[in-house]
Amino acid sequence: MNTKPLRHGYTTGACAAAAAKGAARMLREQRPVEEVELVLPKGERVAFRLHGQEFDDSAASCFVVKDAGDDPDVTNGAEIHARVRREPLNRSGARTMVFVDGGKGVGTVTKPGLGVGVGNPAINPVPMRMITEGVKEEFSVVCLPQVLHVTISIPNGEELAKKTLNARLGIVGGLSILGTTGIVRPISAKAWTDTLDAALDVARACGCETIVLSTGRTSELVAIHAGIGDRGPGTGKTLPEEAYVMMGDHVGYALRACARKGVRHVILVGQFAKLLKIACGHEQTHVSSSELDLQMLAEWLHELGSRSPVPGPWSRYNTARQVLEESGNDSLFMELVCTRARDAARRLAPSLDIKVLLAGYDSTVLYFG
């Protein structure tokens, strides 16, 4: 069967740079501009349609509608606005200067570790450079130096940000202006791994030596409600919110990133089916191998002989959760799987001290060790 290729889109950073370039051109030429061509960081030339054009002698504004392609991006369809305001610079030998700020709907950085200074608008370095260079380029043909003030805004950015991990990363009040290539790859693992790296950078900058890596929000909440300390549930110093990092299905990447960034201790948190996949050696737990995982689990339980808490035949089991429930949450059974998950994780990142927390489907802690 032929499947239609997924369509790529463009980052908020590329859209912001295009809008700023369009506004700058309107301000310089004092006429409406319908479209601008932007050169992305890897050299690709892309045309962006402009909307909402307004201008007078001192300022101009417009917006680009974010197109994320076939990626399920919450910012798809968002209006990325830019306003460029100018002041004459009456100094001999002076050069045109560009200052970029965030307006309504663009978040503010409140925690270290993100590559953007605390207190600054959440506009990442590559988009910041694209915006600055694009505006300067438009005014490079003007003899009189200018001071140009660029404001990037997203009208519904604060509401959209609630659907992202921005608050956890310490970005408050709106969205981030992101992108290193200008292109959004559809359903890309890179979006997850970029967020993982950012969350770990924030955690390390905040002094966290113990990181809680969870496979999802449900299991993470179990760990939070259990009062995870640096030595486990209800023990030691309570961990700050920055220590909690959702790795999703990217266990291998997350563990190696922790090791690379100097993390010392990791608490791996997940529900039974995900921990079973880790125990079976999967670095990416989204893989469709449930049947093979259950076969491996059957072999492990066979080694227990008469002590096995799971009645046969195995052909009647369809899911890992069903097996756990049939065992009656047997402690020996849970320890078997969690120990193997911990050992598999340690093989992926030998420098880390790793412990495993099994989150029950009823939101309780079933195992820690």
Curated annotation (Swiss-Prot):
It comes from the Bacteria. Keywords: Cobalamin biosynthesis, Methyltransferase, S-adenosyl-L-methionine, Transferase. SUPFAM superfamilies: CbiD-like. Belongs to the CbiD family. This is Cobalt-precorrin-5B C(1)-methyltransferase. Transmembrane segments: none annotated. It catalyses: Co-precorrin-5B + S-adenosyl-L-methionine = Co-precorrin-6A + S-adenosyl-L-homocysteine. InterPro entries: CbiD (IPR002748), CbiD_sf (IPR036074). Gene3D superfamilies: CbiD-like (3.30.2110.10). GO terms for molecular function: cobalt-precorrin-5B C1-methyltransferase activity. Pathway: Cofactor biosynthesis; adenosylcobalamin biosynthesis; cob(II)yrinate a,c-diamide from sirohydrochlorin (anaerobic route): step 6/10. It holds the Pfam family CbiD.
